[in-house]
From Swiss-Prot:
Membrane disposition: Multi-pass membrane protein
EC nos: 7.1.1.-
Family statement: Belongs to the complex I subunit 1 family.
Transmembrane segment boundaries: 27-47, 97-117, 128-148, 166-186, 204-224, 266-286, 308-328, 347-367
Keywords: Membrane, NAD, NADP, Plastoquinone, Quinone, Thylakoid, Translocase, Transmembrane, Transmembrane helix
Main localization of the protein described in the UniProt heading: membrane
Assembly, per entry: NDH-1 is composed of at least 11 different subunits.
Purpose of the protein: NDH-1 shuttles electrons from an unknown electron donor, via FMN and iron-sulfur (Fe-S) centers, to quinones in the respiratory and/or the photosynthetic chain. The immediate electron acceptor for the enzyme in this species is believed to be plastoquinone. Couples the redox reaction to proton translocation, and thus conserves the redox energy in a proton gradient.
EC class: translocase
Annotated gene: ndhA
Cellular component aspect of the GO annotation: plasma membrane-derived thylakoid membrane
Protein name, as recorded: NAD(P)H-quinone oxidoreductase subunit 1
Pfam family, one: NADHdh
Stored InterPro entries: NADH_UbQ_OxRdtase_su1/FPO, NADH_UbQ_OxRdtase_su1_CS
Organism: Synechococcus sp. (strain CC9311)
Length: 372
């Protein structure tokens, strides 16, 4: 297996080549990962917002944004700048501290979760051995921020929206975690890198989606519910709750909710790509590519090609899922709150438990195929 590109090592070697010491190069690297995550997350959101507006326009037989840049690609940037300069209003009887802290607690855990997303063998910010556990832990913080925002607004619609958001997030967090646990059981690791490496044996046929079709569907449905996408957008249902927990927010605080929602959608799509669709898996064995180029498998040229293709493969798979999520938003009706909770507790949770038990049995019966 090709070791792939190593961002930290390449960065340090480049700075040391300019005459800096190894310690100085390491110090300069420290803020770079978070900057890289922020840039990647914001660019991902801008692309997703543009895709959503163009796809929704196509579904409704409209043109969509077309004047702000070619094909309207600058429209999301214009919307973001508009929100930046809008007045930030705090209601008179709102709890100003909790009102301000709520959006921060919603968006910060989502951004931190990007640290464990790999785009290649060494193309990730933090290869912690418990990356999946870290992501589940961070995602469990978000309902606190949603409930805090609804409560602090001193508005009945905001409070109901916050309660709905917390109930929905808790209801779907459990089956989602059980679906991921089945994948972890097969790969014998909580590391996202190990999970992708476990899917590289036979190309497309070794993807986890073939061994975990039920887990894949459970994860995707729960991810849409966690992102509050239609048909699961009850916390901000306009006909019932005005804008839910976002009702009293404006300016940059409202933009944080908007940003967090789309960052979470792109993150969920990337995680589905990593857990079930082989991640950065190269379409052909790397040994064949190295042989065709007449280079050793660890040659810089081979690493560059495999790293680039890995990033492209991961992003393409993720945006295919984003496209499906956008289509679902504009083609499916909203469910009722009782239907949403029944789906989570009475259907997905038992199904996820059965899927986990069946995976454990298959792992014992067929250890080679199921990662024994």
């Amino acid at each position: 297996m090709s070791p792939g590109l190593d961002l930290e090592q390449s960065f340090s070697q480049a700075l040391e080549g300019l005459g800096l010491s190894a310690q100085a190069a390491r110090m300069l690297w420290l803020p770079f990962p978070m900057l890289l995550v922020l840039v990647a997350a914001v660019v991902g959101v801008l692309v997703t917002v543009w895709l959503e507006r163009k796809i929704s326009a196509a579904v409704q037989q409209r043109v969509g944004p077309e004047y702000a840049g070619a094909l309207g690609v600058l429209q999301p940037l214009a919307d973001g700048l508009k929100l930046l300069v809008k007045e930030d209003i705090i209601p008179d009887r709102a709890d100003s501290i909790l009102f301000t802290l709520g959006p921060v607690l919603v968006v910060v855990p989502v951004i931190l979760s990007w640290l464990i997303v790999p785009f290649g063998q060494n193309l990730l910010i933090s290869d912690v051995g418990v990356g999946i556990f870290l992501w589940i832990s961070l995602s469990s913080v978000q309902p606190i921020g949603l409930l805090m925002s609804g409560y602090a607004s001193n508005n009945k619609y905001s409070l109901l929206g916050g309660l709905r958001a917390a109930a929905q997030s808790i209801s779907y967090e459990i089956p989602l975690a059980l679906a991921v646990l089945a994948v972890v059981m097969m790969s014998n690791s909580l590391s996202t890198v190990d999970i992708v490496n476990q899917q590289t044996g036979a190309g497309v046929l070794s993807w986890n989606i073939w061994r975990q079709p039920v887990g894949f569907l459970i994860f995707w449905i729960c991810a849409l519910a966690e992102c509050e996408r239609l048909p699961f957008d009850l916390p901000e249902a306009e006909e019932e709750l005005v804008a839910g927990y976002q009702t009293e927010y404006s300016g940059m605080k409202f933009a944080l909710f908007y940003l967090g929602s789309y960052i979470n959608l792109v993150l969920s799509a990337l995680l589905v790509s990593i857990l079930y669709l082989g991640g950065w898996g190269f379409p052909i064995p790397v040994e064949w590519l190295a042989s065709w180029l007449g280079q050793p498998i660890d040659a810089p040229l081979v690493q560059l090609i495999t790293g680039t293709v890995g990033i492209v493969m991961t992003v393409l798979k993720a945006y295919l899922l984003v496209f499906i999520a956008i289509l679902l938003r504009w083609t499916t009706p909203r469910v009722r709150i009782d239907q949403l909770l029944d789906l989570g507790w009475k259907f997905l949770l038992p199904l996820a438990l059965v899927n986990l038990l069946v995976t454990a049995a298959l792992k014992l019966a067929f250890p080679v195929a199921f990662g024994g």
